[in-house]
Amino acid sequence: MIAPPYEAPRKGRVRLLVLGLLGLLAAWAAWQAITWPDVSALAEEDPETTAFIERYRDGGWLGLGQDREVEWKWVPGSRISSNLKRAVIVSEDIEFFSHNGFSTREQRAALEDAWEEKKQPRGASTITQQLAKNLWLSPSRNPLRKVKEAVLTWQLERALTKRRILEIYLNVVEFGEGIYGAEAAARHYYGKSARSLTVRQAAELAAGLPRPRSWHPGSKSRSYQRKVRSIERRMAKASWLRRRV
């Protein structure tokens, strides 16, 4: 039986489409390989900037296309209060010292918080996942970005110690508009160094991490104040953390 004459051109178009898609995929993979960050270098070197800081600095959040002032000062982990380390861990990632970069418990906690506050669930990322996003990625939730985040998280967990991951995270995470890192936050809100933060102050800073532009020390939000008190209670219960940080 002779095939209808239109089938051959159709097969040819499909073949060209498949080859084109494969070519695009290969080009994307090659570009990722060329631009992929050297994660292992962070074991010894402090990052000079982050994707989130640069995005804010050039007005990327609002498409302003202009330089914006950033408050940021790097300090060693030894100069960051253990109160803040404990507050951030109980608030953001209680399994930080035991997981491999990913945690289903954080996903459950996000849903519980959303139910309590009657709001959409917050992000359920671990500290390591948040660090990968802050250092190299964007706030976008598209699938390719999430895949890249997962790979970078896996690499961070294998290249760095937990203490180093926490040190970098606390130095680059946003604590308010244009305020990055524990030292800048402590000086901006309390006029003191990060090593001198009290339990209450640490809880206030940690409570703002999910929404740093609206939740920060001085915020009158009832949800924020409840979060602060909740973190203080969790810190009191998690006495075992004192031996880890």
Residue ranges and their predicted role:
Residues 2-245:
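Juxtamembrane regions of bacterial inner-membrane/periplasmic proteins
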